[in-house]
């Protein structure tokens, strides 16, 4: 070799050596280059950060601090003691313990300005249902420094259901009111505050209805209702009447809110109601602050002091203390969209969000369509129909995997169900999109997929915007569409700067390398084609979208997953939520899914297989997440215990009861509509000293109608119901019986101490609630006789008691630890009598 040749070779080697990138550059390329290993790292980090932030945001222990000031410490200690005393026993309206709670509260407030509300009300509480109620609310008024401001009502109910100690529902609300009362006793508020410790919320919101008739109601402009539909945890802002009042919640120290639950009420996904409904319908503006999970302990004996903590109580109480110090309320009365994250509160009128949505819906198609035209026509981006088949095909197949195995499993293992479903959805997308990628010649299938996902979000956003004010919980769709569409738009803009093949590559190249197995082919392309734009696209789309979807979806699922026990319709709804949740969790990573490496695919396959197998093998209920059964014992012609629950579970529980085995009682199980069943049996454990006597009074005929009356004697009783044949009874009266029904006006009226209600469409049921334990009920009514009878009418009377039920004590004591019990009716036992009038 000549000296010149040696010199040239040395020069070339030196040039190659000097052109080698340094360690930093190689590190950046290995992390941000579009390689399977890089994507795996990004995905793992996204999962860890998303789950970690969501866990922190929803954690009571990590986000709420106990008070440090001496006054607030004393208030919390006193209120916690109040809660322990209030929830010592179940204290339903029909129990003596209810009177004890009333007297306990009255003793605390006796030195303040208060009124032992004795309103008697009568109103139509449902279609064909009329209710008569005697109230014993406790009202307290603390006058503010500015008498020109409308008063603020704070409300909580001190009754429980007969099957629960009522700690969360609503002992913590009552204890929080007492805490606020002690606070304002030391710090005069600016506006007058009226406290309504109301009774009998559980069976018809009666305490709230009674307050609306009280003279103090006229002072009130705003309200804060404190409730509980779970058992401890964090108190969430369930709903607000309007933006003007909702935005004041941003001033509390520990805001925790989402308008998703508000939409759940508006769309009737959440069926239970609170006093909020009464106050809103009466024209007040306010908020509903409540504990919301877990619902399988709601209204059961598990709603007890052991399952809550002072920190839960302090969360509700401290926010109430802060809220009562609000200043002037904005006049805006349109629905509000609101949420919190990491303690930061955000609220906006629904109209403002709608305007943003309209701009986004119009702007992105208008901008992206010309760009797409230019790219395809002048930049030679080759697209085929097959490019656009992947996402819709995979989405359709993924919907089919909504329910895996045991349908009840979501009640106790929601994370397992979501993880299994999501893993299967990811695998479906992975297989389908890799197939599409294999047959396509497109040089940027990733951007095509981004555009398709953007279109999916666009369609959803159109629906959300068109639906209007009832859809205040779908604000996350705006965020999802914005980040996805913006990133797609950036990709299209990058393509417009791409030179036709043979030219120089742009800074944001649309070119995407083809790859083989694992990472070896990721390094085969020249350095100019490392494609770092994918990391920017990933960071713009996936972290924000994943956090929005995961945090919102998990909040919804934790709030409603227990309702799968309530009906087949609820089961279908829950699994629809799971499928939608999984789809939206996966959509942000769909553009990058073909780059998943073998370890992610293997891990997802293991999760899917193990999840499916466990869903078939694991019992759906356990001590921590029990099944709820509902109990009522009816005493009358056929003394029977009735237990209601989902089909397939009730008989096994009851067959092991001692009274059933010893008496060889026959279990009679009957399938009910919507996936429920009722099992009945005769119990030897009959309650004692429960008597109902019904006597009739003379009747009279007038203008074709017949008037009659009955007297109901039910010692130690507060609650009875009179059932009439459908559509025949046109008027009812509680009090003295009279014959002048023709002169009675439609609706409610009061005459000489009698409470009268007339409805020409017919009254099928009259509910009676009284305070005097031993006073008889006197009920008159007017009815229209059938053509084929002699004018008589059979009336059924059922009176309820909330205690003294040995059969209920037996089922609680001997049932498995994965079962909890709740009341089916207003009491645990009902005594039934029939009388011909």
Swiss-Prot record:
List of residues binding Zn(2+) 1: 157, 169, 227
Pfam family, one: Peptidase_M28
Glycan-bearing residues: 143, 561, 689
UniProt keyword Iron, yes or no: no
One example of a Gene Ontology biological process annotation: proteolysis
InterPro entries the UniProt entry points to: Fxna-like_M28_dom, M28_fam, Peptidase_M28, PFF1_C, PFF1_TM
Annotated GO MF terms: metal ion binding; metalloexopeptidase activity
Domain of life of the native organism: Eukaryota
Alphabetic keyword roster: Glycoprotein, Hydrolase, Membrane, Metal-binding, Metalloprotease, Protease, Transmembrane, Transmembrane helix, Vacuole, Zinc
Cofactors that this protein relies on: Zn(2+)
Membrane topology, as annotated: Multi-pass membrane protein
Co-factor binding details: Binds 2 Zn(2+) ions per subunit.
GO cellular component: vacuolar membrane
Cytoplasmic side: 1-36, 377-384, 437-446, 496-539, 594-598
EC number(s) given by UniProt: 3.4.-.-
Active site: residue positions: 201 (proton acceptor)
Site feature Transition state stabilizer, where: 298
Vacuolar side: 58-355, 406-415, 468-474, 561-572, 620-837
Binding site for Zn(2+) 2: 169, 202, 299
Residue spans crossing the bilayer: 37-57, 356-376, 385-405, 416-436, 447-467, 475-495, 540-560, 573-593, 599-619
Localization, UniProt: Vacuole membrane
Family named by the database record: Belongs to the peptidase M28 family.
Function: May be involved in vacuolar sorting and osmoregulation.
The protein's name: Vacuolar membrane protease
Source species: Candida albicans (strain WO-1) (Yeast)
């Amino acid at each position: 070799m000549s000296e010149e040749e040696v010199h040239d070779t040395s020069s070339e080697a030196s040039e190659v050596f000097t052109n080698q990138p340094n360690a930093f550059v190689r590190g950046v390329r290995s992390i941000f280059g579009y390689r399977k290993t890089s994507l795996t790292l990004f995905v793992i980090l996204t999962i860890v950060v998303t789950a970690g932030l969501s866990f922190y945001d929803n954690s009571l222990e990590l986000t709420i601090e106990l008070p440090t000031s001496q006054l607030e410490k004393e208030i919390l200690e006193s209120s916690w003691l109040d809660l322990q005393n209030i929830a010592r026993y179940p204290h339903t309206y029909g129990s003596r313990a209810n009177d004890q709670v009333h007297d306990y509260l009255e003793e605390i407030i006796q030195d303040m300005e208060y009124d032992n509300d004795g309103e008697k009300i009568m109103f139509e509480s449902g279609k064909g249902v009329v209710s008569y109620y005697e109230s014993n609310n406790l009202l307290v008024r603390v006058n503010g420094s500015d008498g020109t401001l409308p008063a603020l009502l704070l409300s909580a109910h001190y009754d429980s259901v007969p099957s629960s100690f009522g700690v969360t529902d609503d002992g913590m609300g009552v204890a929080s009111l007492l805490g606020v009362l002690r606070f304002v006793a030391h710090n005069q508020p600016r506006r007058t505050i009226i406290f309504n410790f109301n009774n009998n919320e559980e069976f018809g919101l009666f305490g709230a209805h009674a307050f609306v008739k009280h003279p103090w109601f006229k002072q009130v402009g705003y309200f804060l209702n404190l409730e509980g539909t779970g058992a401890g945890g964090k108190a969430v802002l369930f709903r607000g009447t309007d933006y003007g009042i909702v935005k004041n919640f941003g001033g509390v120290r520990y805001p925790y809110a989402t308008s998703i639950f508000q939409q759940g009420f508006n769309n009737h996904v959440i069926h239970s109601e609170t006093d909020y409904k009464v106050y809103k319908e009466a024209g007040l503006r306010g908020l509903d602050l409540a504990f919301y999970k877990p619902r399988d302990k709601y209204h059961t004996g598990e709603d007890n002091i052991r399952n809550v903590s002072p920190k839960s109580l302090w969360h509700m109480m401290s926010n109430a203390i802060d809220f009562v110090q609000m200043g002037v309320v904005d006049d805006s009365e349109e629905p509000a969209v609101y949420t919190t994250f990491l303690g930061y509160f955000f609220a906006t009128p629904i109209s403002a969000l709608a305007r943003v949505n309209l701009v986004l819906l119009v702007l992105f198609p208008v901008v992206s369509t010309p760009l797409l035209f230019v790219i395809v026509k002048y930049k030679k981006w080759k697209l085929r129909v097959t490019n656009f088949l992947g996402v819709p095909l995979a989405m359709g197949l993924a919907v089919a995997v909504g329910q895996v195995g045991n349908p009840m499993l979501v009640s106790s293992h929601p994370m397992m169900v979501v993880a299994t479903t999501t893993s299967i959805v990811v695998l479906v997308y992975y297989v389908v999109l890799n197939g599409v990628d294999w047959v396509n010649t497109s040089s940027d299938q990733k951007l095509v997929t981004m555009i398709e996902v953007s279109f999916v979000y666009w369609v959803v956003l159109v629906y959300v915007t068109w639906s209007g004010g009832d859809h205040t919980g779908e604000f996350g769709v705006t965020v999802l569409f914005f980040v996805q569409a913006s990133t797609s738009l950036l990709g299209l803009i990058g393509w417009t700067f791409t030179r036709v093949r043979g030219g120089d590559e742009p800074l944001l190249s649309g070119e995407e390398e083809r790859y083989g197995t694992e990472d070896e082919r990721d390094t085969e392309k020249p350095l100019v084609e490392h494609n770092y734009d994918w990391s920017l696209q990933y960071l713009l789309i996936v972290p924000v979208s994943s956090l929005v979807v995961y945090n919102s979806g998990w909040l919804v699922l934790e709030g409603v997953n227990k309702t799968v026990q309530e009906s087949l319709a609820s089961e279908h709804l829950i699994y629809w939520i799971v499928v939608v949740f999984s789809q939206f969790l996966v959509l942000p990573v769909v553009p990058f899914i073909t780059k998943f490496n073998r370890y992610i695919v293997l891990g997802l396959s293991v999760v899917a297989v193990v999840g499916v197998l466990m869903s078939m093998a694991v019992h759906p209920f356990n001590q921590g997440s029990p099944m709820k059964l509902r109990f009522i014992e009816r005493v009358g012609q056929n003394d029977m215990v009735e237990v209601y629950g989902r089909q397939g579970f009730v008989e096994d529980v009851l067959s092991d009861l001692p009274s059933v085995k010893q008496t060889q009682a026959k279990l009679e199980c009957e399938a009910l509509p919507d996936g429920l069943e009722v099992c009945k049996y005769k119990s030897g454990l009959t309650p004692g000293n429960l008597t109902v006597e019904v006597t009739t009074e003379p009747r009279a005929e007038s203008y074709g109608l017949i008037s009659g009356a009955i007297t109901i004697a039910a010692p130690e009783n507060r609650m009875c119901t009179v059932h009439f044949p459908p559509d025949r009874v046109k008027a009812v009266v509680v009090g003295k019986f009279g014959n002048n029904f023709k002169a009675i006006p439609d609706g409610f009226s009061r005459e000489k101490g009698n409470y009268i209600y007339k409805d020409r469409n017919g009254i099928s049921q009259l509910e009676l609630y009284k305070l005097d334990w031993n006073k008889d009920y006197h009920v008159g009514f007017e009815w229209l006789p059938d053509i084929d009878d002699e004018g008589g009418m059979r009336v059924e009377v059922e009176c309820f008691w909330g205690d003294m039920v040995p059969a209920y004590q037996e089922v609680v004591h001997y049932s498995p630890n994965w079962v909890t019990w709740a009341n089916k009716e207003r009491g645990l036992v009902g005594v039934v009598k029939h009388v011909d009038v």
